[in-house]
Amino acid sequence: MLNNKKDFSIIQEYSKALELLDNYDHQVVIKPEGLKKDTYQLTYEECRELIASMSFGASSTIFGREKSEGALKGIVDSVYQSAFGEDAYPTVEEKAANLLYFIVKDHPFIDGCKRIAASIFIYFLNQNNLLFRNGEKIISDSSLVAITLLLAESKPEEKEMMVKVVMNFLGW
């Protein structure tokens, strides 16, 4: 039975998460404030190097193999697209969340899409000096798994909401 301030304070420790869940339920998730302009541009070649370095590739001939030539390059290029001189995704958080979403949902590889998507996502965050705050990872291993699976299981019409959810994870 909840009968003291200590019990209530435990719940208060998760107030941001509970508020995000409530906003999701009501379909009113917003982009977090204080987003960072990107300083580092990811390349297709870097992504291929990263994939080649992953240990999963040693035990599989299909891990990281693109289903069609240029699929991953198209995804990487898409997060840097602009319209009327304005970036479609102007912040690191928007680029990172969309990069993760597109690789997971577009499924450009025969095998390893979620692992590759998560790896490129954290690599991109790290290159933009956003993966660690005060020496601590901003996304725990379990959170990385959860958001990657959340995106994988989401419906296409939920894209904008899912991207905003990921962006909120990055702002905490």
Q: Where are the language model's segments positioned?
A:
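FIC/Doc superfamily catalytic core
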Residues: M1-W172
